[in-house]
């Protein structure tokens, strides 16, 4: 998350050295999601490659340089309130939480600020991106070493580090 003065101080320009730990970036400052040329949001996502990842998996920026700190802060806080307090799981619902925060803060829409700031923030990346907010656990998975032709079902056991079954585990 970056909150500062105009742009993002070029922190997304040269790439990152974060390997496969690609973050969900929010940079709600002037011009970070601008549609006139490449934006900081795009640069965060475009850096790196499939074989040499770097940068972000998705980013939210603001499409214009005419923003105001107070409104950007509310959208920003609404995004993170959605992720951590309301346990919203997707990039798009987190951004919508930011939009609802500004709407709820300024329901009378002073100077068209509510409508404007809702339309200026934008998401670069998959809106259905699942946002993970905790460190994954190590699991022990027990499964057959071979599967006979014609098999239509099998037992797969997923246990946590204490040997307890993991409820709702999905194995692919």
Which functions belong to the PLM regions below?
Residues 152-153, 162-172:
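Short, ordered, surface-exposed loop/turn motifs in non-cytosolic proteins
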